[in-house]
Amino acid sequence: MPRSGLNRAVNEPRRLTLDLPTRGGAVAVLDWGDQARPVDLVFAHANGFNALTYRTLLAPLAERFHIWAPDLRGHGAATLSTATEARRGWGDHGADLAAVLDAIKGPPVVLAGHSMGGTAGLLAAVQRPERVRGLVLADPVIWSRTTVLAFHLPILRDLPRRSPLVVNALKRRSRFDDRDAAFAAYHGRGAFKGWPDAVLRDYLSDGLVPDPDGGLMLACTPQWEASNYAVHAHDPWRAMKALSCPTHILKAEAGLACHVPERPFGLPRVMVETVPDSTHFLPMLQPEVVRGALAAMLEAPDAA
């Protein structure tokens, strides 16, 4: 591809709609880089966000690599079901990503993600080991082994539904007159504290959709965001034990999401690095660190 084409790909990702018939719908995919080469990297976003939120992180890599970033179920332009009845864990997100991997032609890819997207990537990697040659997980949501076991007990299964994350998500304002109003409401506050303006605007670009009653509304509804916080009957520890590819976890220094120690016993494929001065939102606040880890895995010999 000519250099001018690469520049356009970096600044303006192509937008694809990927039908997933085995999953009952479709996902929207941002496609960066040279389409003449196979997909190198698949990146999954965190709960409540969307693929475009990570443009600042991913776009510079598109000069050398072909990148897919899907909107997960219930986010962005995905059309997969968001029914919450009888939902118990993130197995749906993992299976959706496995279906995305099935749709990719070519050699195995590096699979990466942030927060819930990282955990979903982990679950997908053990379902499709032949399609993944490496994992990079930015502060994935992985509770302690004891907590994960507790979440599988019927008596404690609904405990997360009373957590502040769930309560606050359900209270979240979901409608705005326009994107400028949403920007003013979010800028410098809550989870968005410290975010560069460009990253916040990228989030809002795909994070808001037309409201039938006028104005804009959140693409990821408060109910779906809360459901993701409330269901944890999946087992990332079992998945890590089953991994057949090298895995690099970037753990936030000031974070409560990832409880994998730096030297996890019995997990020889997993390397954990605590990022100094980082929070759970390190892909937004320290993109160069995450980008470096992605590039290192992409450039590594195939070790899967």
PLM features: what roles do these ranges have?
Residues R133-S174:
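Flexible "cap/lid" loop of the alpha/beta hydrolase fold
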Residues W68, L72-A112, L153, G292:
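Active-site loop/oxyanion-hole signature of alpha/beta-hydrolase fold enzymes
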Residues P107-A150:
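Conserved hydrolase catalytic core segment
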Residues D71-H75, V141, S278-T279:
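Short beta-to-alpha linker loops that shape the active-site pocket of alpha/beta-hydrolase fold enzymes
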Residues S278-P287, R291:
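Catalytic histidine-centered segment of alpha/beta-hydrolase-like enzymes
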Residues T22-W32:
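A short loop-to-beta-strand scaffold at the N-terminal edge of the catalytic core in hydrolase folds
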Residues L30-T82:
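Conserved HGGG/HGGXW glycine-rich cap/lid loop of the alpha/beta-hydrolase fold
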Residues A198, G207-F265:
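Conserved serine/cysteine hydrolase catalytic core
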